[in-house]
A protein has these predicted regions:
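Extended polybasic, low-complexity segments that bind anionic RNA or targeting/receptor surfaces
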Residues: 1-46, 91-207
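Short, structured surface segments that line ligand/substrate-binding pockets
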Residues: 46-49, 55
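Glycine/serine-rich anion-binding loops at beta->alpha junctions
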Residues: 54-91
Length: 207
C-alpha cells in the first residue's frame, strides 16, 4: 500500500496515511488515460458550428449571363463557392462529437491517473482544508506552504463555499468535490491536493 505523509495547512507534517493499493497503487495504463482525456475533451464540444452551402445562401437563383456567346466562363449561379458572397464548399456542419466509455474503462483510467500522481510525488494530503470566511490570502498561503503554488486541483469531501470562493481567484487552481473528479483535471494539475476526509470518501466510492 502506498504510504503518503499528511501535512497541515501550514505545510508541517502531522502524520501519514496508507492509501488503497487498488486505487492509488495501480499500474498506469497510458493508452486508457489517452482515451479518457480524448473522450473528456471531445464531450466538451457543442458541435454547433455551421456554414451556408450554395443552396442555403440567399439569392443566386438567376443565371448571371447566357451560356454561350459572351466569351466568359459559363456560370449557373452567383452563389457558387468561387463567387464572392457564394456558399461555402465543404464547410463545417453541426455534428455530435460525443465519445462513450464504459464504466470499467473509466474506472481503470481514474485509478491510473491517481496512481500516476502518487508515483510522481504529486499527491498532497492535507489533514483539513478550511477557511474562516472568504480569504484568498488563506488559500494562497496554504498552497505556497505545501508546495502547490502553480496548477493545483483541490479535492474536498463536500462543497465548502468558503474554500471554493477563496480559491476561485487564484490562477491555475481548481476546486472540486471527491465524487466529481475526472481524469483530465487530475492529469492537468501539477499537484493533486486532497483533504484526509476526501481520501476516505474516494476510497469508499471508487474502490
Amino acid at each position: 500500500m502506498p504510504n503518503v505523509k499528511v501535512v497541515n495547512m501550514a505545510g508541517a507534517e502531522v502524520g501519514s496515511i496508507e492509501l488503497s493499493d487498488v486505487i492509488f497503487g495501480a499500474e498506469v495504463n497510458e493508452a486508457v488515460l489517452h482515451a479518457a482525456v480524448r473522450a473528456f475533451l471531445m464531450n466538451q464540444r457543442q458541435g454547433t458550428q455551421s456554414t451556408l452551402t450554395r443552396s442555403e445562401v440567399s439569392g443566386g437563383g438567376r443565371k448571371p449571363w447566357r451560356q454561350k456567346g459572351t466569351g466568359r466562363a459559363r456560370q449557373g449561379s452567383t452563389r457558387s463557392p468561387q463567387w464572392t458572397h457564394g456558399g461555402i464548399a465543404l464547410g463545417p456542419k453541426p455534428r455530435d462529437y460525443h465519445i462513450d466509455m464504459n464504466k470499467k474503462t473509466k474506472r481503470v483510467a481514474l485509478y491510473s491517473a491517481l496512481s500516476a500522481k502518487v508515483a510522481a510525488g504529486d499527491l498532497i494530503v492535507v489533514d483539513d482544508i478550511k477557511c474562516e470566511g472568504y480569504k484568498t490570502k488563506t488559500m494562497t498561503a496554504m498552497l505556497s506552504a505545501i508546495g502547490a503554488e502553480k496548477k493545483a486541483l483541490i479535492v474536498l469531501p463536500e462543497v465548502d463555499s468558503f474554500v471554493v470562493k477563496s480559491a476561485a481567484n487564484i490562477p491555475g487552481v481548481k476546486t472540486t468535490v471527491y465524487n466529481t473528479i475526472n481524469v483530465y483535471d487530475i492529469l492537468n494539475a501539477d499537484k493533486f491536493v486532497v483533504s484526509k476526509a476526501a481520501i476516505a470518501k474516494i476510497e469508499e466510492v471508487f474502490a
